[in-house]
UniProtKB/Swiss-Prot annotation:
GO terms for cellular component: chloroplast thylakoid membrane; photosystem I. It is found in: Plastid, Chloroplast thylakoid membrane. This is Photosystem I reaction center subunit VIII. One of its GO terms (biological process) is photosynthesis. The gene is psaI.
Amino acid sequence: MAASFLPSILVPLVGLVFPAIAIASLFIYIEQDEII
């Protein structure tokens, strides 16, 4: 039963968390590049 509703949670989680991590890491890279 857990496997039936797992994709409905996992897909939005990956769709929101992965871009957030990518944007945050890019922002940190740009900030460090400006400081140096």
